[in-house]
C-alpha cells in the first residue's frame, strides 16, 4: 500500500471449519441461514457463487447491491474463474436478455427485470438451476423477491433456493416473522449459527487474536455532560409516555434510547397516529433525536465541535422562536457550563454559583471578554498515543516476526478519521487551536492568553500525562493515581491495560516533541480528506517519531460507498496491529475470522472504549439484543411446524395456487343450472415502471394475468375502456403541485371512456388532507382538497378511488373487471400522449377539440355532433343561430355559442359599464 505501488489483490480466504460444515448441510438440503453479524454470510454466498460459475448452470442472485456484485466478481476474477457472473441491468435490451440467460452461469439481475422476464417467459424457467437470496430477512409476502420466488416455483419444481442473512434482530419483530419468511422462500430448513454456537465458539477460541482492552476514563467535565444529557433524555421519555399512554413502556427505556435503532422504534409506534399527535409530542421526538446526537458528539469528537453544536442549537432556538423545554432544565444549564469549561475559562466567574455563572456567560458572550483557553483534549487521543508508542517499541524488536507490523486504526466515520489524522500529524494542541480559530474567530485575545499559559505549563503537564510505572506491580497504583484529575490538568486514565508496561520516556524528547507539535503550521496539513481511506505515514511526524518503516492507515467503519472497502484494506495491508478507536460489533467479528483464516500470523487488537459510558452501553446492548434474538429463534425453531409441501416441489402447496374463488361464492343458477362456466382468463396491462411496487405481485396472486408493457398513458389498463393512474399520497401532492396530474387526466380522458385516479395510502401511516378546523379555512388555491375538487370539475368522467393498501387495490381491480372484456396490450402500447390512432381521434385534432369544449354552450354531449358538421373554427363562425340550434339540439346552448362568437369586444365592455 505504499505510494506509487498498486494495491495487492488477494483472494478471499478459504472457508473455515464451521463454514465448511454449514456449506455441506446447505448443499444437502435447501434452507435459510441466519448467522451472527460479521460471521461471514457474504463468504457463504461467495462460495456458492464460485460453485455455480459454469455454463452448465443458471443461478439467479437476488437482493444484492451493485458494490457487492462488483466485489464478488473481482474476487472470482482473482481466483481465476473463467465464466464470471454477469449483471443484467436496463442497459441490456429486452430482446437480448434471453441470450444472456441461455449462456448459463451466475446472473445478478434487478428484481424488476426478473419479474418482467418471468411474466413474459423471456427467461427459460425450466433451465434455472437455482436461486440464491441475500438479506433474506427482507423477504415479506408482497415484495418483489417473494414474487420472483413464487413465479420460479410455479414454473420450476426442481431448482434449489438457498437464502442467507446476518440480521437475527430483524426476526425479533412481528408474530412468527421467521416462519413467514421461510414460507415466502419455499424452504423447510432453518440453519442458526450464532456466535455462541458450539462449533463456531470452539474454532474461533483456538485462533483468537490477542486483545488489549483499554477502558479510557472520561474527564470530569465529560462525565458531568453525559449525566446531564441522560437526565434530560429521561425527562423527555417520561413526558412522551405521559402524553402517549398507549406506547410500549419497555421499548421507551433509557437503555434503548441510547441504542442506534431507537429512532426506528419510536417512529414504528408513532407513525400510525402521527397526523393526530400534538405539537408537544412531535417536538419531544425531535428533542430525543437531538439529545442522542449530543451523546454521540460527546464521545466521538473534540470539545470545540461539541460546544459549537450546543451553541448552534441555542442560537437556532432563539432565531426561530422554538421552545424546547429541555433547554430550560437545570441539567441543560450544567451541560452548557461544562461544555464551555472544556473550551475556555472565564477568570472572573465563580464556579460555586451555577446560576450566576450562566448569567455572566450569557451577558459576556457578545463583549470583548478576556478568556483563558483550556481546549480539553479527548482522552482517547492520548490513549491512542500510548498505543502507538507501544507499537513502535515492539516494532524495534520485531525481527523474529519478519519486520515491523502494519497498523490499521478504525474509527466510526469519516469525520472522526479526519480528526485523528489531524491529531497525529499536528498534535492535540495545534489541532484544537486551529479548530477553535475556525469556529470562534472573534476570540483572538483568548488565543494569546492560552498560548502563553501553555508555554509556561507545557513541560510539567506532558511529563505527568505520559508517565508510566517501570515495574508491573505499580500499574494498579499508577492507574488509581491517574484517575484523580486536578485543576488545569487533563490526563489519560488507563483503567485496564492488558499489555507490557512501556519504559519511561525521556523528558527531553517529550519537550522537543511538544515544541514541534506547536510549531506545526495548520496549513501544513492538507485540507482535502479522502472519504474512504486515510493514509498517514507517521515516520515524517517529528512529534512522535514512531512507525518509521510501516504504514499506518486510518479507515472509517461506517459510511463508505463501498461496503467492502474495509475488508479490502484488511486483506491487502494485512496489519499486525489493529486499533479499534470505536466499538463496532460487525468488524470485531470480522477480525476474528481474519485471524482464524491466517493461522500462525500474529494479530493484536487494541480496543479503546470509554469505561462506564453510553458508548460502552451501546456496544453491550447490541450484543445482548443479538443474543436474545438468537435465543428466540432457537425456541421458535423447536416449536415450528413445517408442512411437507413447503418447498413447493409438487402441486399441493397452496401458496402456489392462484385465484381467490371460494366455496361460499354464490352461483348464478339461471345459466345452465349453475354449472361451472369456463370463463376467459382475466388479464391486466401494466406499465413497466409499476413493477417497483408490490401491487402487480398481489394482482397476479389473485389469478389475473399480467402483461407488462411500457405505457405512456395510465399505469393499469383494466378493460378497453378503463384506464387507471395510480398515485401514492406523496406522489399525488407533487403531481398536483407541478401540473403533471392534470396532463395525465387530459390524456386518459381523451383516449378512454372511464379514466380512474387511484389514490393508494399506507394503513400504517394514516393521513389527513384537511385539518380539524372549519372547512372554509381550507378552500384555497394551495390546498390539496381544493385542487382535487377542481380536477373533478374539470374532468366530469374522472373517477377517484381511495385504497388503504395494495391488497385492497388488487381486490378492487378484480371486482371492476368482472364481466368486462379484456384489454389489448398492443392497442394500449400504441396510445401515446400525442397519439391519433384511435377511432375517436382519427377525425378530430385534440387541440381544437379542447378549445371547442371551453366555449359557452358546448359540452361533452354536443361536442361530437358539432365537430361532425364543421371542419374548423372558421366554418363554425359562419353558421347562423338557427343552424347551431339544429346541430346542438338546444336553443339556449346555440344562443350562448352564437353570442360568444359574434359579440364584439366593445359591446362586451359597454354592457359591463351599463351593469355598473
Swiss-Prot record:
Region named Helicase-like: 1-457
UniProt region (HhH2, dimerization with ERCC1), positions on chain: 837-905
EC numbers, comma separated: 3.1.-.-
InterPro entries in the record: ERCC4_domain (IPR006166), Restrct_endonuc-II-like (IPR011335), RuvA_2-like (IPR010994), XPF (IPR006167), XPF_nuclease (IPR047520)
SUPFAM superfamilies named among the record's database cross-references: Restriction endonuclease-like, RuvA domain 2-like
Alphabetized Gene3D superfamilies for the sequence: 3.40.50.10130, 5' to 3' exonuclease, C-terminal subdomain
Short motif Nuclear localization signal, span: 486-491
Renumbered residue ranges of the record's region Disordered: 460-487, 502-526, 660-679
GO BP annotations listed: cellular response to UV; DNA repair; double-strand break repair via homologous recombination; double-strand break repair via nonhomologous end joining; negative regulation of protection from non-homologous end joining at telomere; negative regulation of telomere maintenance; negative regulation of telomere maintenance via telomere lengthening; nucleotide-excision repair
Family membership noted in the UniProt record: Belongs to the XPF family.
Subunit architecture: Heterodimer composed of ERCC1 and ERCC4/XPF. Interacts with SLX4/BTBD12; this interaction is direct and links the ERCC1-ERCC4/XPF complex to SLX4, which may coordinate the action of the structure-specific endonuclease during DNA repair.
Protein name per the record: DNA repair endonuclease XPF
Amino acid at each position: 500500500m505504499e505510494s506509487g505501488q498498486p494495491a495487492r489483490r488477494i483472494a478471499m480466504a478459504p472457508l473455515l471449519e464451521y463454514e465448511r460444515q454449514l456449506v455441506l448441510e446447505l448443499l444437502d438440503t435447501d434452507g435459510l441461514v441466519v448467522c451472527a453479524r460479521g460471521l461471514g454470510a457474504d463468504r457463504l454466498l461467495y462460495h456458492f457463487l464460485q460453485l455455480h460459475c459454469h455454463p452448465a448452470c443458471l443461478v439467479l442472485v437476488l437482493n444484492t447491491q451493485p458494490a457487492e456484485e462488483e466485489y464478488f466478481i473481482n474476487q472470482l476474477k482473482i481466483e481465476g474463474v473463467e465464466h464470471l457472473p454477469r449483471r443484467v441491468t436496463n442497459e441490456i435490451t429486452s430482446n437480448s436478455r434471453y441470450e444472456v440467460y441461455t449462456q448459463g452461469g451466475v446472473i445478478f439481475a434487478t428484481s424488476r427485470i426478473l419479474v418482467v422476464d418471468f411474466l413474459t417467459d423471456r427467461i427459460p424457467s425450466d433451465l434455472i438451476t437455482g436461486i440464491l437470496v441475500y438479506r433474506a430477512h427482507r423477504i415479506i409476502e408482497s415484495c418483489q423477491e417473494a414474487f420472483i420466488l413464487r413465479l420460479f416455483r410455479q414454473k420450476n419444481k426442481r431448482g434449489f433456493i438457498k437464502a442467507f442473512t446476518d440480521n437475527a434482530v430483524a426476526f425479533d419483530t412481528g408474530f412468527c416473522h421467521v416462519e413467514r419468511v421461510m414460507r415466502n422462500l419455499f424452504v423447510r430448513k432453518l440453519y442458526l449459527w450464532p456466535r455462541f454456537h458450539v462449533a463456531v465458539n470452539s474454532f474461533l477460541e483456538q485462533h483468537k487474536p490477542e486483545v488489549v482492552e483499554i477502558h479510557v476514563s472520561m474527564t470530569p467535565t465529560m462525565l458531568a455532560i453525559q449525566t446531564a444529557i441522560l437526565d434530560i433524555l429521561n425527562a423527555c421519555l417520561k413526558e412522551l409516555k405521559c402524553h402517549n399512554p398507549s406506547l410500549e413502556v419497555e421499548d421507551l427505556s433509557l437503555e434503548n434510547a441510547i441504542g442506534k435503532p431507537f429512532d426506528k422504534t419510536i417512529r414504528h409506534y408513532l407513525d400510525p397516529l402521527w397526523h393526530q399527535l400534538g405539537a408537544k409530542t412531535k417536538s419531544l421526538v425531535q428533542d430525543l433525536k437531538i439529545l442522542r446526537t449530543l451523546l454521540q458528539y460527546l464521545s466521538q469528537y473534540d470539545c470545540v465541535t461539541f460546544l459549537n453544536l450546543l451553541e448552534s442549537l441555542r442560537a437556532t432556538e432563539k432565531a426561530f422562536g422554538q421552545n424546547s423545554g429541555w433547554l430550560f432544565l437545570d441539567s441543560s444549564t450544567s451541560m452548557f457550563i461544562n461544555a464551555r469549561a472544556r473550551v475556555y475559562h472565564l477568570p472572573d466567574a465563580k464556579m460555586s454559583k451555577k446560576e450566576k455563572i450562566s448569567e455572566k456567560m450569557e451577558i459576556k458572550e457578545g463583549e470583548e471578554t478576556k478568556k483563558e483557553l483550556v481546549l480539553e483534549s479527548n482522552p482517547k487521543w492520548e490513549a491512542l498515543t500510548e498505543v502507538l508508542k507501544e507499537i513502535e517499541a515492539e516494532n524495534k524488536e520485531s525481527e523474529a516476526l519478519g519486520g515491523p507490523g502494519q497498523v490499521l486504526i478504525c474509527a466510526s466515520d469519516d469525520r472522526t478519521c479526519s480528526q485523528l489524522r489531524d491529531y497525529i500529524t499536528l498534535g492535540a494542541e495545534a489541532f484544537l487551536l486551529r479548530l477553535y480559530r475556525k469556529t470562534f474567530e472573534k476570540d483572538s485575545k483568548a488565543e494569546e492568553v492560552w498560548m502563553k499559559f501553555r508555554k509556561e505549563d507545557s513541560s510539567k503537564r506532558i511529563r505527568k500525562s505520559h508517565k508510566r510505572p517501570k515495574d508491573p506491580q505499580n500499574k494498579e497504583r499508577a492507574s488509581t493515581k491517574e484517575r484523580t484529575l486536578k485543576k488545569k490538568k487533563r490526563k489519560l486514565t488507563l483503567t485496564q491495560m492488558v499489555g507490557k508496561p512501556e519504559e519511561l520516556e525521556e523528558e527531553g524528547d517529550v519537550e522537543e516533541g511538544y515544541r514541534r507539535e506547536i510549531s506545526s503550521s495548520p496549513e501544513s496539513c492538507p485540507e482535502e480528506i479522502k472519504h474512504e481511506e486515510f493514509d498517514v505515514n507517521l515516520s515524517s511526524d517529528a512529534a512522535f517519531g514512531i512507525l518509521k518503516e510501516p504504514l499506518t492507515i486510518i479507515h472509517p467503519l461506517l459510511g463508505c460507498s463501498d461496503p467492502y472497502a474495509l475488508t479490502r484494506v484488511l486483506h491487502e495491508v494485512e496489519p499486525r496491529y489493529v486499533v479499534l478507536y470505536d466499538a463496532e460489533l460487525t468488524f470485531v467479528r470480522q477480525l476474528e475470522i481474519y485471524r482464524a483464516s491466517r493461522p500462525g500470523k500474529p494479530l493484536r487488537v487494541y480496543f479503546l472504549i470509554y469505561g462506564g459510558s453510553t458508548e460502552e452501553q451501546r456496544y453491550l446492548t447490541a450484543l445482548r439484543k443479538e443474543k436474545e434474538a438468537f435465543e428466540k429463534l432457537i425456541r421458535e425453531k423447536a416449536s415450528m411446524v413445517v408442512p411437507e409441501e413447503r418447498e413447493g416441489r409438487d402441486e399441493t402447496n397452496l401458496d402456489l395456487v392462484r385465484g381467490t374463488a371460494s366455496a361460499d361464492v354464490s352461483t348464478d343458477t339461471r345459466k345452465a343450472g349453475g354449472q361451472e362456466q369456463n370463463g376467459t382468463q382475466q388479464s391486466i396491462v401494466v406499465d413497466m415502471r409499476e413493477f417497483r411496487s408490490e401491487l402487480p405481485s398481489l394482482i397476479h396472486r389473485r389469478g389475473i394475468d399480467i402483461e407488462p408493457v411500457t405505457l405512456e398513458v395510465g399505469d393499469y389498463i383494466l378493460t378497453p375502456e378503463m384506464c387507471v393512474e395510480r398515485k401514492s399520497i406523496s406522489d399525488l401532492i407533487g403531481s398536483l403541485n407541478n401540473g403533471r396530474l392534470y396532463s395525465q387526466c387530459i390524456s386518459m380522458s381523451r383516449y378512454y371512456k372511464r379514466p380512474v385516479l387511484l389514490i393508494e395510502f399506507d394503513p400504517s401511516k394514516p393521513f389527513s388532507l384537511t385539518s380539524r378546523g372549519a372547512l372554509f379555512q381550507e378552500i384555497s388555491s394551495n390546498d390539496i382538497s381544493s385542487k382535487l375538487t377542481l380536477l373533478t370539475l374539470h374532468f366530469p368522467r374522472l373517477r377517484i378511488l381511495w385504497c388503504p393498501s395494495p391488497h385492497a387495490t388488487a381486490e378492487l381491480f378484480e371486482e371492476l373487471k368482472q364481466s368486462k372484456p379484456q384489454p389489448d396490450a398492443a392497442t394500449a402500447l400504441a396510445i401515446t400522449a400525442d397519439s391519433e390512432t384511435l377511432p375517436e381521434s382519427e377525425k378530430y385534432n385534440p387541440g381544437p377539440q379542447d378549445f371547442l369544449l371551453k366555449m359557452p354552450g358546448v359540452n361533452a354531449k354536443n361536442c361530437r355532433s358539432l365537430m361532425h358538421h364543421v371542419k374548423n373554427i372558421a366554418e363554425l363562425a359562419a353558421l347562423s343561430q338557427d343552424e347551431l340550434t339544429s346541430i346542438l339540439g338546444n336553443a339556449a346552448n346555440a344562443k350562448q355559442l352564437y353570442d360568444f362568437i359574434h359579440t364584439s369586444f366593445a359591446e362586451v365592455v359597454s354592457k359591463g359599464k351599463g351593469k355598473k
